[in-house]
């Protein structure tokens, strides 16, 4: 993991709910990488490392986290 994380992740839902939504995306498969990113953040991975793990730019990771923190799961729907 890189450096110290400055942005905290808001835990809108329990980890078990994230896991369920990843496994059963309900017709929104494009949300799965975003949910995986959030799950990695829940587990303590930095934004940069989590973004790299799901194959997106660091800026996209910061954008996803901002939307998640402000809007919850609905913020990840494109």
Where are these regions (language model features)?
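Short, basic alpha-helical/linker "hinge" immediately adjacent to a nucleic-acid-recognition surface
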Residues: 1-32, 38-78
